């Protein structure tokens, strides 16, 4: 019976395995050429997304922009003057590894902390602007973020100019404890004085705007705008559901939900933001 037993063979590929056809000779894809949409999951050319103001061309998801990108998009070219560029956080509570975390974020983002403030023109109208950056410790508000925003508001009050703040934040920065929480009161007090002077404050809510930022300056605007599908809230959805023992609507804490319930004034597509802000400044100039 052994004569009829099926023999075992080793399959040898006929593909040329010559060293000249090594991996180095195969086509390569440059790093950073593709990006995956965080909403629909589609793989997209990064250049197409960048050319579309970082909006997904497939599902219209407004992907996150960093502070420098947003300033370049919103402010007229050559008019931006930055405030307090080199202000850096201390570690007043001696929180373990906080300095190392800050340094790591600075190297990653090119920023000293989570907000960029300054003076510039939007369609020819001068304004003070503050733009938060979620790439820097999720835009958390510590002493530097609060101080820079407060100084920007005070500068606007002194110059009798409007203020525009683009918010994106996970809330207060836990590493700074009470020093972080007091920024809520400080920024709000500065805005109160700005308001008493009869000046305009426009708040633009971008994804995500949560925690202490929502509970302070983000919701104090004379006019409150938001990008589509922006997450806006104070406590997290799961915490609220567990507290009230109820299931929340699927669109809860979205800009659309808040607009429907009167908490924000307008939802604006990103590509229309500069025109919209320019028109608001023109009407109030």
Curated annotation (Swiss-Prot):
Primary location group: cytoplasm
Family under the similarity heading: Belongs to the AccD/PCCB family.
Residues holding Zn(2+): 37, 40, 56, 59
Cofactor note: Binds 1 zinc ion per subunit.
Keyword Magnesium: no
Chain ranges of the CoA carboxyltransferase N-terminal domain: 33-285
Molecular function via GO: acetyl-CoA carboxylase activity; ATP binding; carboxyl- or carbamoyltransferase activity; zinc ion binding
Coiled-coil intervals: none
Top-level taxon of origin: Bacteria
Cofactor dependency: Zn(2+)
A biological process from GO: malonyl-CoA biosynthetic process
Zinc finger (C4-type): 37-59
EC number: 2.1.3.15
Localization in the cell: Cytoplasm
Catalysed reactions listed for this entry: N(6)-carboxybiotinyl-L-lysyl-[protein] + acetyl-CoA = N(6)-biotinyl-L-lysyl-[protein] + malonyl-CoA
Keyword Transmembrane helix: no
NCBIfam families: accD
PANTHER family, A to Z: ACETYL-COENZYME A CARBOXYLASE CARBOXYL TRANSFERASE SUBUNIT BETA, CHLOROPLASTIC
Protein's name in the database: Acetyl-coenzyme A carboxylase carboxyl transferase subunit beta
GO CC field: acetyl-CoA carboxylase complex
Pathway: Lipid metabolism; malonyl-CoA biosynthesis; malonyl-CoA from acetyl-CoA: step 1/1
InterPro entries registered for this protein in UniProt: AcCoA_carboxyl_beta, Acetyl_CoA_COase_Trfase_b_su, ClpP/crotonase-like_dom_sf, COA_CT_N, Znf-ACC
Keywords: ATP-binding, Cytoplasm, Fatty acid biosynthesis, Fatty acid metabolism, Lipid biosynthesis, Lipid metabolism, Metal-binding, Nucleotide-binding, Transferase, Zinc, Zinc-finger
Pfam families: Carboxyl_trans (PF01039), Zn_ribbon_ACC (PF17848)
Function: Component of the acetyl coenzyme A carboxylase (ACC) complex. Biotin carboxylase (BC) catalyzes the carboxylation of biotin on its carrier protein (BCCP) and then the CO(2) group is transferred by the transcarboxylase to acetyl-CoA to form malonyl-CoA.
Organism taxonomic ancestry: Bacteria, Bacillati, Bacillota, Clostridia, Eubacteriales
